[in-house]
Amino acid sequence: VARVAIAGSTGSIGKQTLDVIRSAREGEHQVVALSVNSSADEVVAQARMFKPVIVVVSDKKAREKVARELKTTDPKIEVVAEPEQMSVIADVVVNGVVGFAGLSVTMAALKNGKRLALANKESLIAAGPIVAPLRKIAGAEIIPVDSEHCAIHQCMRSSHNQSRDVQRLLLTASGGPFRGKNLESLKNVSVKEALAHPTWSM
């Protein structure tokens, strides 16, 4: 049984992870921890369904609400403030936390020698030099699970030349505010235009 901790369990990645676990063979995975910032009602429903050992809630008011609600139905579930505990009890940590807030989850998982299913790109972009040495800890492993970096990972692992070191990767933008623009029009792009990146529902 793989013990799974899900940081950002009420976000897109977290919900998809729970869907996969729900549809897997019974006994294949056990959700041992769920983590949210402030989505109290959603995480209470998830906790009642998956019966984790701990629920991490960053926001104090939301944490108090979650603790009250679970105390009546699931008193064995511990409600805590810090996400670091998750990686101690899990075999696999899914990091679906948005932004720089996900760095502590990434670092704790790797320091504890866990497999990290990483959707939080900011951990590597903003703190790559800090995170990279942690990969050398026995058992520590990063598996990219979101969008482009997962696709690259799969391509590299399926290549007949996978033993060779990759010297350079080029990622092309498939969308964004400048899709369809010609080179001449890109010369006068403003900061405001560059920041107007489209978003979509996952």
Sequence positions of predicted segments:
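Short gly/pro/ser/thr-enriched loop/turn and capping motifs at secondary-structure boundaries
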Residues: A62-E64, S123-A127, H149-A151, G176-F178
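N-terminal glycine-/serine-/threonine-rich beta1-alpha1-beta2 phosphate-ribose binding loop
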Residues: V1-F100
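A short helix->loop->beta-strand "cap" motif at the edges of active sites that frequently abuts
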Residues: K51-V53, D74-I77, N112-R115, I137-A140
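Rossmann-fold dehydrogenase core element
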Residues: V131-H149, R168-L169
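Conserved anion/nucleotide-ligand pocket segment
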Residues: H149-M202
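Active-site-proximal loop->helix
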Residues: Q16-E26, A45-Q46, L124-G139, C155-S158
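Rossmann-fold NAD(P)-binding glycine/threonine-rich loop
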Residues: V66, F100-N112, K121-A140
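Short beta->alpha connector loops at strand-helix junctions that form conserved
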Residues: S58-D59, A119-K121
